[in-house]
Amino acid sequence: MAPSGGQEAQICDSETFGDSDFVVVANRLPVDLERLPDGSTTWKRSPGGLVTALEPVLRRRRGAWVGWPGVNDDGAEPDLHVLDGPIIQDELELHPVRLSTTDIAQYYEGFSNATLWPLYHDVIVKPLYHREWWDRYVDVNQRFAEAASRAAAHGATVWVQDYQLQLVPKMLRMLRPDLTIGFFLHIPFPPVELFMQMPWRTEIIQGLLGADLVGFHLPGGAQNFLILSRRLVGTDTSRGTVGVRSRFGAAVLGSRTIRVGAFPISVDSGALDHAARDRNIRRRAREIRTELGNPRKILLGVDRLDYTKGIDVRLKAFSELLAEGRVKRDDTVLVQLATPSRERVESYQTLRNDIERQVGHINGEYGEVGHPVVHYLHRPAPRDELIAFFVASDVMLVTPLRDGMNLVAKEYVACRSDLGGALVLSEFTGAAAELRHAYLVNPHDLEGVKDGIEEALNQTEEAGRRRMRSLRRQVLAHDVDRWAQSFLDALAGAHPRGQG
């Protein structure tokens, strides 16, 4: 596969090398360029778990970050000249990749989120395949690869992130064979039979094989990738079982050996634990309970508004528990914080309408004037407010139909130094493999979800403390630093540069 529109990439001259020994390449920068009412611009922290996970790693290594600055650039706004070169923002070196409205529509909203996202999440929604989307995906990936090439010093380590940039490793290797390249996928990698639906399946696998190390959350994803690389590209692959942070698989392609491994991502659990102990956070948590009418129990959901997250499942389960009298309407409330997401994609617009209809129905059926049983907020919550909600709630509901990891579950656990609360967790999250002392449920089994919620609501204090203590032991020991270090250690031990 040619890296972009059939054109061969050119290896950069040494004069074009950057000065960063460590480069993160992701769809978004850790900050967005935002236009103010007076027409001026400012930088604002980007939403999303990827930024939360990677920013501390980048700061410690004094590296550079390549990504989209969050503003569409159609060439008509002269004041966007700030994006012309590297930027130092909050002590981070940023290399913006400028994307037009058409780029966003076809590369991001189209191929990334209407093709890859549903395919990789077990086809909960039917993937759409359009050649013009694919062509734009190739073109934008080439631009990211070129930006990374310009940012990286000779012999640097480049860490490419997630499904939007799966072609970048091969493209970057063609540009800069001196680099050590890692790739990590933050969403599930699908079973072989689903991935084979993809018209451009071989090109995707070839793109990933440009890396020295390809990482997934779980061993199953790594095994799927090895099978596909053998079947589609003809690599000689290892046949043993891939372990967690150990027992790496291998795919041999020509003179190169690509490591394949499982590295479950986590959160900055120490920082969350510290923040949740803060006096102001504790006071805000008490205020939240008061504002909700001092219910006996608070159920909490925190999600992007996405069809994979199972928000409708927990609402349906809560509604039926109320109808059956297993949950009392006068002493239990459900708070759902739903962060807006991909609002221009039709399936997401439909989902929002459906969720808001469900909320209205439940409140109409079981709420009272001034006392709804479901409190629904369709907006992002500031970090401290979110932590206060974690501390205030009695049961955390994490019920995705499919999720690569789900960091919200780990964030909740990290915030419960009081050993209070309970976690109801979908079996179809990556987190379920580690958080075995949660109340694990199958989101496709509504009765099972209802039973899990009821059990969590009615657990004894002793049983709850025992479960939370075990969950916290796991989350505090395996934080985001350990995730990053385990990946980067494995990358450093992968076959070295120059295998291009």
UniProtKB/Swiss-Prot annotation:
Pfam family, one: Glyco_transf_20
Ligand binding (UDP-alpha-D-glucose): 48-49, 304, 309, 407-411
Residues that hold D-glucose 6-phosphate according to the record: 28, 108, 162, 342
GO molecular function, one term: alpha,alpha-trehalose-phosphate synthase (GDP-forming) activity
Cellular component terms per the entry's GO annotation: cytosol
Sequence intervals crossing the membrane: none
CDD domains linked to this entry: GT20_TPS
Reaction equation(s) it catalyzes: ADP-alpha-D-glucose + D-glucose 6-phosphate = alpha,alpha-trehalose 6-phosphate + ADP + H(+); CDP-alpha-D-glucose + D-glucose 6-phosphate = alpha,alpha-trehalose 6-phosphate + CDP + H(+); GDP-alpha-D-glucose + D-glucose 6-phosphate = alpha,alpha-trehalose 6-phosphate + GDP + H(+); TDP-alpha-D-glucose + D-glucose 6-phosphate = 5-methyl-UDP + alpha,alpha-trehalose 6-phosphate + H(+)
UniProt record, GO biological process: trehalose biosynthetic process
Coiled coil: none
Metabolic or biological pathway, per its Swiss-Prot or TrEMBL entry: Glycan biosynthesis; trehalose biosynthesis
UniProt-listed Enzyme Commission number(s): 2.4.1.15, 2.4.1.347
Record site feature (Involved in alpha anomer selectivity), residues: 117, 187
Keywords attached to this entry: Glycosyltransferase, Transferase
SUPFAM superfamilies: UDP-Glycosyltransferase/glycogen phosphorylase (SSF53756)
Family: Belongs to the glycosyltransferase 20 family.
Protein function: Probably involved in the osmoprotection via the biosynthesis of trehalose and in the production of glycogen and alpha-glucan via the TreS-Pep2 branch involved in the biosynthesis of maltose-1-phosphate (M1P). Catalyzes the transfer of glucose from UDP-glucose (UDP-Glc) to D-glucose 6-phosphate (Glc-6-P) to form trehalose-6-phosphate. Probably also able to use ADP-Glc, CDP-Glc, GDP-Glc and TDP-Glc as glucosyl donors.
SUBUNIT field: Homotetramer.
Record-given protein name: Trehalose-6-phosphate synthase
Species this chain originates from: Mycobacterium bovis (strain BCG / Pasteur 1173P2)
Species lineage: Bacteria, Bacillati, Actinomycetota, Actinomycetes, Mycobacteriales
